[in-house]
């Protein structure tokens, strides 16, 4: 019997060969490495046949041990049974379960947070408008010259019924704006009135032609002599009173003139 210290074997070709070594009476220990599995031979009880005296007769078949074919082949090939390292200590290395990135960085504590990104100019102005106009953007309303004349006519006929507050609520304006309209004494001249009429006529013609192209209104007949028709229209308009002219223009602009119904 030979007492043999641990000697690492080469990688086994198959697991079946390792099982046969275990069945033959060889004690093996399984050791793990980073790359692969290795078997180390801890203790070989015997590598050859037992030499028994002739007078001894075996009582059972288990008393005689025969080496496995693998052990015989290794002995025939001159496999050295001397230990390579007598004082070798096997240390197991385990990989770290926590990644390096998750470990706390001492320098990270000293670094402060990034400063807030500077807002753009249009965003700052938008926030300022939201704070200033909480109900939304409501620019001051501007009345047309004809609507201004209608406000004056209504207030002149019945100041108690058509007061400043009533007119401001109807025209969706501030009472101060209505008060300034009533206080103002400016009136357009005849030349300015004529330019205004021509502008409204061109606008009416442009809108009518556009609606007729869409099929919403019938085609408009072109006048044979525009100069004569223009002069006749100007004469008829000059004969009409101011409130009727204003009512006609307001109806064309799809405005509900409250004061037109009262003046009729």
Swiss-Prot record:
One term under GO cellular component: mitochondrion
Biased composition (Polar residues): 94-105
Compartment(s): Mitochondrion
Keywords: Mitochondrion, Transit peptide
Superkingdom of the organism of origin: Eukaryota
UniProt entry tagged with the keyword Mitochondrion: yes
Main location: mitochondrion
Region entry Disordered, spans: 86-117, 218-240
Organelle transit peptide: 1-12
Family statement: Belongs to the RRG9 family.
Protein purpose: Required for respiratory activity and maintenance and expression of the mitochondrial genome.
Name of the molecule in the record: Required for respiratory growth protein 9, mitochondrial
């Amino acid at each position: 019997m030979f007492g043999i210290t641990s000697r690492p074997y080469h990688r086994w070709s198959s697991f079946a060969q390792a099982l046969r070594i275990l069945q033959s009476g060889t004690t093996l220990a399984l050791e793990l490495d980073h790359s692969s599995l290795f078997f180390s031979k801890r203790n070989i009880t015997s590598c050859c046949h037992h030499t028994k005296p002739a007078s001894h007769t075996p009582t059972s078949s288990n008393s005689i041990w025969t080496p496995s074919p693998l052990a015989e082949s290794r002995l025939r090939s001159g496999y050295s049974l001397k230990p390579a390292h007598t004082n070798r200590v096997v240390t197991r290395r385990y990989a770290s379960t926590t990644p390096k990135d998750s470990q706390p960085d001492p320098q990270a504590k000293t670094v402060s947070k990034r400063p807030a990104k500077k807002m753009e100019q249009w965003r700052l102005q938008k926030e300022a408008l939201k704070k200033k106009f909480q109900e939304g953007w409501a620019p001051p309303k501007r009345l047309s010259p004809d609507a201004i004349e209608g406000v004056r006519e209504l207030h002149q006929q019945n100041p108690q019924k058509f007061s400043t507050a009533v007119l401001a609520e109807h025209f969706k304006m501030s009472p101060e704006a209505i008060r300034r309209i009533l206080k103002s004494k400016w009136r357009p001249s005849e030349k300015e009135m004529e330019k205004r009429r021509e502008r409204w006529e061109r606008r009416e013609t442009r809108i009518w032609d556009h609606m007729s192209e869409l099929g919403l209104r019938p085609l408009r007949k072109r006048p044979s002599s525009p100069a004569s028709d223009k002069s006749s229209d100007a004469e008829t308009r000059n004969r009409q009173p101011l409130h009727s002219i204003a009512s006609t223009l307001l109806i064309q602009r799809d405005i509900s003139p409250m004061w037109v119904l009262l003046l009729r």
